[in-house]
């Protein structure tokens, strides 16, 4: 089941990482790889603006540095929705087309599965800024497929890992 931190998964499991181009998202990719995932990346563009194009270029450059495949998703049609809801809708659609079970992001939040098998969102335990509120609008179906690899790490730990990973 999806989780946090350095849990381990079967080698054949695949995950589609929402890549922003930030060092933090690069660290999340490396953590997923260390957990045994085959990682592909996607950058979601919600508008046709210079800022969105620059962010997409940064994400593609990071993916190249990480040696992961990166696809660009044009999700302008979803731009009227909540930003995170739109981004994850685009990620899940792409994951389904690619036959990938999980999606991931570099948000500071944690996922846990309760005794009934329901995936629930929680704040990070690490003292990192709580970004679970940004994901609160996601449906249970999305949460069941979501992995948040940074949920157990403080920003200082992520910065140290970025140095170790030469990001």
Residues covered by each model-derived region:
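ATP-dependent adenylation/nucleotidyltransferase module used to activate substrates
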Residues: 1-138, 147, 155-158, 163-164
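Ligand-binding/active-site lining segments
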Residues: 167
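Short, glycine-/aromatic-enriched active-site segment of Class I SAM-dependent methyltransferases
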Residues: 144
């Amino acid at each position: 089941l999806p989780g946090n931190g350095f849990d381990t998964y079967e080698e054949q499991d695949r995950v589609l990482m929402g890549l922003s181009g930030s060092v933090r998202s690069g660290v999340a990719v490396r953590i997923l790889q260390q957990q045994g995932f085959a990682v592909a990346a996607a950058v979601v563009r919600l508008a046709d603006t210079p800022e969105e194009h620059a962010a997409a270029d940064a994400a593609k450059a990071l993916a190249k540095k990480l040696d992961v495949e990166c696809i660009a998703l044009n999700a302008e049609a979803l731009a009227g929705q909540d930003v995170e809801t739109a981004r994850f809708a685009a990620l899940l659609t792409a994951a389904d087309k690619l036959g990938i079970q999980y999606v991931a992001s570099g948000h500071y939040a944690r996922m846990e599965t309760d005794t009934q098998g329901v995936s629930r969102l929680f704040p990070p335990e690490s003292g990192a800024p709580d970004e679970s509120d940004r994901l609160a609008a996601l449906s249970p179906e999305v949460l069941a497929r979501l992995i948040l690899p940074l949920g157990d790490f403080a920003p200082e730990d992520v910065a140290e890992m970025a140095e170790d990973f030469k990001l």
